[in-house]
Amino acid sequence: MSSPQKTSLAARRRAERMSREAMYEVIRSPLITEKATLLSERSQVVFRVAIDATKPEIKAAVEGLFGVKVIGVNTLVNKGKTKRFRGRPGQRSDVKKAYVQLVAGQAIDLTAKLA
């Protein structure tokens, strides 16, 4: 029996055939924080990604858009806080972040224009 962490072959193949438009839907924006800046020195980059994005999709999108080799992807979901808006309770949206580990020596210049 396979462990729940293993991705199916079909899921990996779907991720490899993603269109450029689908890649932009998976990766929403880079996350620029103090922690992300420190991690960039160790060949890691942090992105805000779609809430339903899988690790193989994130890996394929980063490799396809930025032309780098990805070693691994760690993800987390920040649950939206309950806040009050005009006296009524509301809910902020959940946010999914992806920590992407690149091959040593590679980096992504997030200030450059994507072609």
Curated annotation (Swiss-Prot):
One of its GO terms (biological process) is translation. GO terms for molecular function: rRNA binding; structural constituent of ribosome. The keyword Cytoplasm does not apply. Pfam families: Ribosomal_L23 (PF00276). One of its GO terms (cellular component) is ribosome. The keyword Ribosomal protein applies. Keywords: Ribonucleoprotein, Ribosomal protein, RNA-binding, rRNA-binding. One of the early assembly proteins it binds 23S rRNA. One of the proteins that surrounds the polypeptide exit tunnel on the outside of the ribosome. Forms the main docking site for trigger factor binding to the ribosome. Part of the 50S ribosomal subunit. Contacts protein L29, and trigger factor when it is bound to the ribosome. HAMAP family: Ribosomal_uL23_B (MF_01369_B). Belongs to the universal ribosomal protein uL23 family. This is Large ribosomal subunit protein uL23. It comes from Granulibacter bethesdensis (strain ATCC BAA-1260 / CGDNIH1).
